Amino acid sequence: MDMKSGHSSPVMTDSPPISNSRLTIRQNRLPYSSAAATAISQNNNLLLTVPRKKTGILDDVKSNGWLDAMKSSSPPPTILNKDNLSNDATDMTYREWMQLKYPSALTSFEKIMSFAKGKRIALFLDYDGTLSPIVEEPDCAYMSSAMRSAVQNVAKYFPTAIISGRSRDKVYEFVNLSELYYAGSHGMDIMSPAGESLNHEHSRTVSVYEQGKDVNLFQPASEFLPMIDKVLCSLIESTKDIKGVKVEDNKFCISVHYRNVEEKNWTLVAQCVDDVIRTYPKLRLTHGRKVLEIRPVIDWDKGKAVTFLLESLGLNNCEDVLPIYVGDDRTDEDAFKVLRDGPNHGYGILVSAVPKDSNAFYSLRDPSEVMEFLKSLVTWKRSMG
């Protein structure tokens, strides 16, 4: 499809405090502060130097709140009755949160589309927790055929990209739609559809023959691959005796899942990770939904990936463009913030069944509501003629 000319309109209360005495993550492994980090000139100004700090944070997790953060990183599932209605007393709190702060993108759909009229929509979607449910086994996070059909249909009318923390190859395997843009490793591995281009102003954009076709790739962290491969092997070896742990290779980052690890062994998981990466100052440790992630220290995130893709589509800094980003994870907040505060004004839509603070404008409860939203976009576009 013509991504440039064919679209006339186109917990997070995340973490209570945990003490370092209970979980001894060394302070020099805590990630950089974006305010304190300084870019150095080489490598397209992407590599950052990381000042050593006496105290620090693991992303937005206070350094004295590690174990509690691990406990609260994935809320328990809401129990539904036979009519799929929540029996949880906190459901009232959720409805109040939705009504007062983050209105449903479904009930607000007409309002969103009134703003979209005459604009070209660009759509960005997270994968896990957005297009597929969060599952116990990461390798089994399959999207339904109905969801795949919804994504395929919406991509007929709007340029569409999947931006995931997974490796690009893995998320492509799950989605299996060649007409999309894919950004794996939290946006550090971007691939265009066949016949479409990426922003060639960046020196790291290359053309390759992959998956039976010519595609363009942008990989701002490519020089980190040997280091990440080495750390991956070490993490697999050091955690092999911890029952339930899974080390996932996401190419430009590594995920250590502890969702299936007994809680009494969580500190052991974290200590194993720290023991491996303590000698790698160019890597940082972040925290997600029952997962520890190791990433390169570069000035790149999902928000910058959105801007890069908009540039590639010829849609950057255009008043007649409406970017929409749908995601459920804290890493999606960088994209929400770009659309809220940056020149590419658009709408972030948070997927969450629990109240949390966000940079998003709207909310959806779960992947089933995401699918309904995508179908509504298609219906709206078709009605416009």
From Swiss-Prot:
User: Keywords for this entry?
Assistant: Hydrolase, Stress response
One Pfam match: Trehalose_PPase
Biological process (GO) annotations? Answer: trehalose biosynthetic process
The EC class name is hydrolase
User: What is this enzyme's catalytic activity, as reactions?
Assistant: alpha,alpha-trehalose 6-phosphate + H2O = alpha,alpha-trehalose + phosphate
* Entry's EC annotation: 3.1.3.12
What cofactor requirement does the entry state?
a divalent metal cation
Induction and repression of expression: By trehalose.
Q: Where is this region: Disordered?
A: 1-21
Query: Which tissues does it occur in?
Result: Expressed in flowers.
Q: List the disulfide bonds.
A: none
Q: What does this protein do?
A: Removes the phosphate from trehalose 6-phosphate to produce free trehalose. Trehalose accumulation in plant may improve abiotic stress tolerance.
Q: What is this protein called?
A: Trehalose-phosphate phosphatase A
